[in-house]
Amino acid sequence: MAKKSSIEKNNRRKRMVKNAAPKRERLKAIIADKTLPMEERFAATLKLAEMPRNSSATRVRLRCELSGRPRSNYRKNKLSRIALRELGSKGMVPGLVKSSW
C-alpha cells in the first residue's frame, strides 16, 4: 500500500488539472496561433509560466485504484499487475481467464 500522503498529493493534482484545463488550453491556443502579434503570444507564454506546476497534466501519476501503487499499472483497468492478478484469480474481472497450454 502506498503512503496516503502520496495518494492524496496525486488526487490534489488531478483536481488542479481539471480546474485549470480550460485556461491552459486557451493560453496554449494563443501561443500556437502564428497570426497573432508576437507581444500577445509572449504575454500568453508568461501567463502560462505563472500558473502552478501541478496544473499541468504531465504531473499526474497513474496509480492503482485499489492499492495506490505507482508502477506497473494497466491504464484500461486502472489497476496494478498485483491487484489485477488477485481480482482475476477471484473471478472478479470479467473475461480474464488464467492462461494454460
Curated annotation (Swiss-Prot):
Residues 1-23 are annotated as: Disordered. Part of the 30S ribosomal subunit. Contacts proteins S3 and S10. Gene3D superfamilies: 1.10.287.1480. SUPFAM superfamilies: Glucocorticoid receptor-like (DNA-binding domain) (SSF57716). Keywords: Ribonucleoprotein, Ribosomal protein, RNA-binding, rRNA-binding. It comes from Bradyrhizobium diazoefficiens (strain JCM 10833 / BCRC 13528 / IAM 13628 / NBRC 14792 / USDA 110). It holds the Pfam family Ribosomal_S14. One of its GO terms (biological process) is translation. GO terms for molecular function: rRNA binding; structural constituent of ribosome. This is Small ribosomal subunit protein uS14. Binds 16S rRNA, required for the assembly of 30S particles and may also be responsible for determining the conformation of the 16S rRNA at the A site. Residues 1-10 have a biased composition (Basic and acidic residues). GO terms for cellular component: cytoplasm; small ribosomal subunit. Belongs to the universal ribosomal protein uS14 family.
